[in-house]
Amino acid sequence: MGGTGLLAATADATRAAARTRKARARGGDGTPEQIHLTWGENPATSVVVSWASPEPATRPRVRIGQRVIWAESRPYTDGISGETVWTYHARVGGLRPGATYAYVVTADNDSEAADPFTATFRTAPHGRAAFRFTSFGDLATPNTAWVLSYGQSAYAVDAVESFQPLFHLLNGDLCYADLNPTVQPEVWRDFGNNNQTSAANRPWMPCLGNHEVEFDNGAQGFTSYLTRYTLPDNHVPGFGGRWYSFRIGSVLFVSLDADDVVYQDAGAFVTGPAALTPVAGTGHPAIEPGTSFYVRGYSGGAQTAWLERTLAAGRDDPSVDWIIAQMHQCACSSSATGNGSDLGIRQQWLPLFDRYQVDLVLTGHDHDYERSFPVRGADASAGHEVATGAVVNTLRPHPVTTTDNGVFDTSQGTVHLTLGCGGTDVNLDDYGVDTADAQRQAKVFTRANRPVPTSTADVFTRAGADAVEDAIWSAKRDVATGYGIAVFDVHPDPEDFGGHTSITVTQYHAVDADPVNPATGAKGAPTPDYTEFETFTLLRPRRSEPR
């Protein structure tokens, strides 16, 4: 499918510069940019319109017909650069289910006030209804001046629009601003303006990843993320925006922050030899080489307790058929050059996924596409320590079938998808193989990999996973490319499958987009062409609602 993402990004930058010149002549640039939607508390009747402006906006607002919704201003100051960012959030309620609305975003000092930004969105349907959503993670920006950014991120946003989903799930590692610590707001700005092409037309629902952890930006480093997004309330005091749930039709979506439970230390990190020194005005001291921002356990168990309550309520509700979980890090990834799987998720959350029959888990983290067989329970002592070969209990997920016939009953086991195939310049479509028996192999973190010194003075590193296992749960890997988008079509009508509801999943991939394909060595370039890689169907018995 075609697209003009890179040209559009360049044109947007030119228009933004012209707007800034006009607005400054009027005493400050409150022109809306980085416009994006999220669901409100009830997706059938509410959305949140969020945006930013280069300078403080005067009376920022959204207009729908004759109705004006005033926005909440939510600024923050970046803890490294000292730059202040102005964001705005307008909560729009009282909408009709399944309806399309046009809206305007503006302010008194909007340089485009004569022709303000206008877009449309559609609310979720009420009750059991068919709908489509899309997903990927690890997007980055098209501005290759930034670490890990790559032109494919513009085409990935175009791909979302081409499929016209009701909404998009963005599975963490949004823009990698933490890897560009002295210019974090600029990276976020490029990310937001790139996404606006799609996110202004339909909600983009994110989750936190390890690269949303930034030095000197809040207790867990999430200030940049939390300031930009207004997400459904989890009703857990002190932890708003970090995890949440929402309901559309017969599907309960649960969005989690796996940073809270994983062993892997992969947040902000000063490798050295130089310290990271915030600007003087921030009041923050230099961050010394070897410092990492490790947030495992930050909620003190509050997130896992909330998760169990939410899953239990979902399975007790006869109008809920499907439960889909979104997180960044993986319980089932066999990437050879990426991160792999994490025992922390397997210990704390997979037993809950089993107990409450979570159907589908969508992740990112490894920059590839991988699908598991349906899994339930765990195989004990199936792993080995990399350093010594000693047996390690990795709690390897147990496949309930290893027959890959393209149709899976998720009431019998949970399917995991790794979808870190957004747009970064580090493609990781290279997968583990046990050289002893040619079995698929996965790396597993079973303990923290805190920074250790290297042989170079004042330079530190973090080790990879400490264990490996035969990945008998791995069903499908995309070795052609590390870029793609998953499209999900929810069919609540059970007639086609004898009393079962279904979700059809199609993974589209961007072949030849890899900077260098790890299997062939072939050099590629960003491409707008996404073609079908695989299609499969998930089934589960339809719940019976009381009459």
Please identify what each model-predicted range represents.
Residues 1, 161-162, 410:
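Flexible, charged surface loops at secondary-structure boundaries
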Residues 1, 299, 345:
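Conserved acidic
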Residues 1-14:
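N-terminal export signals
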Residues 3-4, 92, 253, 377:
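Generic N-terminal initiation segments characterized by hydrophobic and/or small/turn-forming residues
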Residues 9-12, 144, 179, 216, ...:
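Residue-level recognition of conserved structural "scaffold" positions that shape functional pockets
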Residues 19-61, 86, 110-115, 140, ...:
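Metal-dependent phosphoesterase/phosphodiesterase active-site architecture
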Residues 26-242, 308-313, 338-356, 374, ...:
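Divalent metal-dependent phosphoesterase catalytic cores across multiple superfamilies
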